[in-house]
């Protein structure tokens, strides 16, 4: 008897769901027809990038081209791009939801585009491999389930040496990639020692600013620093401050050594730090920690 009652209840709920699919679904395209619109909350470049990407791939799947409009009141079945993100969304993070039958994708910085990519991957089953190389299953119907998703990147900066990012913007967006000039203040990205402490300015009069090994100091364009020298720290800190002030829209900079094996400073003070930390990276990490303490609202990368 109990089993019969439970079965009847389950069948009743299934009937409700089938009779009223809009209670659990957001219908974008049905049998090759659509009244859905892509609505931009803000008329800016990142919103247009997200909208164009979504429009392109929904059309590839369904042959339906959804119109893109700006600042209109959404109705059921519409897609809202942009707007306020939940508090837990961080830089380049995003939110996807299908509340009230409306698909909403918002994010911070590039996050709204990454939200579109995630929707296309996880809910429409699209894979993008490279320029004009993608896989998808054509369908005349696109119905989305209930979605309430927030995602933030595990890494603040994401880069690859694949040259496709220069010729294929979709590949770049799809793989959530960035380029140094987009993120790092004044393009200060890897091997920045001689930019921050130019040897042609300081090398001749202050060889003590540069690494000591094999019995002497080695100032030069490819030299490392004497990272325990307090004057070096102050000069670099002032230089970093001026760069950030000249680039107020950026908050990341690379303070990173030059290439070269066994060219690190082995003066008594630097060696003591490295010995204490148990690695040759000890002195550079100690230096960067001091720099991070001086600029608590900034971020630093190194090699």
Give the role of each language-model region.
Residues 1-11:
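Bacterial N-terminal signal peptides that target proteins for export
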Residues 16-19:
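N-terminal signal peptide c-region/cleavage motif recognized by signal peptidases
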Residues 21-26:
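Boundary at the C-terminal end of the N-terminal hydrophobic targeting segment
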Residues 27-37:
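Immediate post-signal peptide segment of exported/extracytoplasmic ligand-binding proteins
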Residues 35, 43, 50-53, 57, ...:
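Feature activates predominantly on carbohydrate-active enzymes
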Residues 60-73, 299-302:
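Short, well-structured beta-strand/strand-turn elements
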Residues 67-90:
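Short, well-ordered secondary-structure micro-motifs within conserved domains or adaptor modules
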